[in-house]
Regions:
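Catalytic-core helical/loop segments in enzymes performing group transfer/polymerization on anionic/lipid-linked
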Residues: 1-176
Length: 176
């Protein structure tokens, strides 16, 4: 069982399927765990480096169990986050990938000797995603490939939601 430190996270459809375990609300007041069911949890989960993630980390450390940081997956939804349920979640038991101030499971994987070459199943999945034109929010129109192939300079605009923790924890600022 996983104790979840946010009612918003508990509202995510199929959360138990994403986490492969039952979930229960880890009701925390003044730093104390008040949930009878959560007292039996083998891990506590919160949202990245937000307050719920910090609560999960603190409770897990006191109880000697794993802390799981959750974040939108790289294929987020069909539509914007406010209007659509997630299609994937990142579950990290080390840190969270966008926080450059501490390690994450992704960082550890990249630094390991483990092969990162996709197997046949991974190659097939990637081919299906490309053929289906799957993107993070799946709301954009078709790419204008002929326009992209025209000679001349191109500008890539990279942006993030104002105030998103990935900017500050990734070493950036609103000016960069």
């Amino acid at each position: 069982m996983i104790g979840v430190t946010s009612k918003g996270i508990l509202a995510i459809p199929y959360l138990e399927a994403f986490l492969h375990r039952p979930v229960v609300h880890a009701n925390v007041h003044f730093g104390q765990l008040w949930s009878v069911g959560a007292a039996k949890a083998s891990a506590f989960a919160g949202w990245g480096r937000r307050a719920s993630g910090q609560r999960a980390k603190s409770i897990a450390a006191r109880r000697g169990v794993a802390a799981l940081m959750l974040e939108d997956g790289f294929v987020r939804s069909y539509g914007t986050a406010a209007r659509a349920a997630p299609l994937s979640l990142v579950v990290d038991d080390v840190g969270i990938y966008y926080d450059s101030t501490t390690a994450s499971a992704l960082e550890n994987l990249l630094a390991s000797d483990q092969s990162l070459v996709p197997d046949e199943q991974g190659e097939a999945l990637l081919a299906d995603m490309v053929a289906s034109k799957i993107s993070k929010y799946n709301v954009g129109g078709q790419w204008d490939e002929p326009a992209l192939r025209r000679p001349g300079k191109k500008v890539l605009v990279v942006d993030q939601t104002a105030g998103d923790l990935s900017v500050a924890l990734g070493g950036g600022s609103p000016d960069t």
